[in-house]
């Protein structure tokens, strides 16, 4: 065997056969540590979930090798006949899940899905209406640093101070005053249902498009445990992770064929080139899972668990914005306890409970500090936690935060260590990827 042939064989064997632990031990170690974190800590970040092994397998498949600019049957590259199958399945399953006529599954994120809608429906400088970030909106709904706040003219509505519910009178007043091109319902920190019919009525009164960003509650909509944006919305955007429990990505849904064509053009070639076909395959798998009866049981449990967690925290003396939750998330207002979200997040992290600091309506703290934390139940529910477990978790949180309030920013190390031990005992009862 010549030296060249031997080298070629060695390259082929190692390149295509070497596992990650051999090919890149540093990355392998980081992955292993992250797996351990997910297995042994309680995940309460509302935007996170735990996907099935089937979704992981699809996303880590050879479809990552394929470029496929365009749409199924209309690609700019050859060899797309099999990735077309994956995308067609994702599209058809999405349409069944949300009972709509058109779906674009190519956006790489919820943010890009929103950008696609903006590109299709507005011109730079046009006005749109969205929920204020401080009241539970999202960066892509007009925050000044975001492209939505730089290229367009956002006008923000907020919640009522007395009950932290959407102020629909203000929405109507602002719509009449500013005549927006688009009105958005949806956000990242609003725990109540949205009055989609009233939003559409307001949009129609000023000739605006009504857009729903259901990134956080799409899985609940798919399962029928949350009101659907359709038939009220002209367009709905979503992520495909969060409550939908798929890979990280985005999607645009509509019943309007003319708008669907605009959204398709906005995503490709407007914003993206070749779509991530391995991620689209993962989306198809997740949508297939969401069409099964088991997913409805899961989604109902997500909501029941969230209510149980909120009730436990209220019983423990903590304030929940709007007094509770209708979906998978809640905001804990820590102002009455004299705590910041930053300190609470750190204390809970030391006890192996993961959440995120979050602003609360009319917050006076900086966004990097905040007066609250956001909690969600999707990931815990995916691993099997029920109402009893979330009541227990609520008790853990009360213990840690009470210790923080008593001891100061360093927290109560003895309480945190004790809670961490009980957290591990709980997660050991509900293993993932074992």
From Swiss-Prot:
Its cofactor is pyridoxal 5'-phosphate. Its EC number is 2.1.2.1. GO terms for biological process: glycine biosynthetic process from serine; tetrahydrofolate interconversion. The record marks 241 as: Plays an important role in substrate specificity. GO terms for cellular component: cytosol. It comes from the Bacteria. It catalyses: (6R)-5,10-methylene-5,6,7,8-tetrahydrofolate + glycine + H2O = (6S)-5,6,7,8-tetrahydrofolate + L-serine. It is an enzyme of class 2 (transferase). The modification N6-(pyridoxal phosphate)lysine is found at residue 242. The keyword Methyltransferase does not apply. GO terms for molecular function: glycine hydroxymethyltransferase activity; pyridoxal phosphate binding. Keywords: Amino-acid biosynthesis, Cytoplasm, One-carbon metabolism, Pyridoxal phosphate, Transferase. (6S)-5,6,7,8-tetrahydrofolate binds at residues 133, 137-139. It is found in: Cytoplasm. Pathway: One-carbon metabolism; tetrahydrofolate interconversion; Amino-acid biosynthesis; glycine biosynthesis; glycine from L-serine: step 1/1. Belongs to the SHMT family. HAMAP family: SHMT. Catalyzes the reversible interconversion of serine and glycine with tetrahydrofolate (THF) serving as the one-carbon carrier. This reaction serves as the major source of one-carbon groups required for the biosynthesis of purines, thymidylate, methionine, and other important biomolecules. Also exhibits THF-independent aldolase activity toward beta-hydroxyamino acids, producing glycine and aldehydes, via a retro-aldol mechanism. Homodimer. PANTHER family: SERINE HYDROXYMETHYLTRANSFERASE, SERINE HYDROXYMETHYLTRANSFERASE 1. This is Serine hydroxymethyltransferase. It comes from Methylobacterium radiotolerans (strain ATCC 27329 / DSM 1819 / JCM 2831 / NBRC 15690 / NCIMB 10815 / 0-1).
């Amino acid at each position: 065997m010549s030296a060249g042939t031997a080298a070629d064989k060695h390259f082929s064997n190692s390149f295509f056969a070497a596992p990650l632990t051999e090919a890149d031990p540093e990355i392998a170690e980081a992955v292993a540590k992250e797996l351990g974190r997910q297995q042994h800590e309680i995940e309460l970040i509302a935007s996170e979930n735990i996907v099935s092994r089937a979704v992981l397998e699809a996303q880590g498949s050879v479809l990552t090798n394929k470029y496929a600019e365009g749409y199924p049957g209309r690609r700019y590259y050859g060899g797309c006949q099999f990735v077309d199958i994956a995308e067609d399945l994702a599209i058809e399953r999405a349409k069944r899940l949300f009972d709509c006529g058109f779906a674009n599954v190519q956006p790489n994120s919820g943010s890009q899905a929103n950008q696609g809608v903006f590109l299709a429906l507005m011109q730079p400088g046009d006005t749109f209406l969205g929920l204020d970030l401080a009241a539970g909106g999202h960066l892509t709904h007009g925050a000044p640093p975001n492209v939505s706040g730089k290229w367009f003219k956002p006008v923000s509505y907020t919640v009522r101070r007395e009950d932290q519910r959407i102020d629909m009178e203000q929405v109507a007043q602002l719509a009449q005053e500013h005549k927006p091109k688009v009105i958005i319902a949806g956000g990242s920190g609003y725990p109540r249902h949205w009055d989609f019919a009233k939003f559409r009525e307001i949009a129609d009164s000023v000739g605006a498009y009504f857009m729903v960003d259901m990134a956080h509650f799409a899985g609940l909509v798919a399962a029928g445990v949350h009101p659907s944006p359709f038939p009220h919305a002209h367009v709905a955007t979503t992520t495909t992770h969060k409550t939908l429990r798929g890979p990280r990505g985005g999607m645009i849904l509509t019943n309007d064929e003319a708008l669907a064509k605009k959204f398709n053009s906005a995503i490709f070639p407007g914003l993206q080139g070749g779509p991530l076909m391995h991620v689209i395959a993962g989306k198809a798998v997740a949508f297939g899972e969401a069409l099964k009866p088991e997913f409805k049981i899961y989604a109902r449990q997500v909501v029941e668990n969230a209510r149980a967690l909120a009730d436990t925290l209220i019983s423990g003396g903590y304030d929940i914005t709007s007094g509770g939750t209708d979906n998978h998330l809640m905001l804990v207002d820590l102002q009455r306890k004299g705590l910041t979200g930053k300190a609470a997040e750190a204390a809970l992290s030391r006890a192996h409970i993961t959440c995120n600091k979050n602003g609360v309506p009319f917050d006076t703290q900086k966004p990097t500090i905040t007066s609250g934390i956001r909690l969600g139940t999707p990931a815990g529910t995916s691993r099997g936690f029920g109402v009893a477990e979330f009541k227990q978790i609520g008790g853990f949180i009360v213990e840690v935060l009470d210790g923080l309030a008593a001891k100061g920013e360093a927290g109560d190390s003895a309480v945190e260590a004790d809670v961490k031990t009980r957290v591990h005992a709980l997660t050991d009862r509900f293993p993932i990827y074992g």
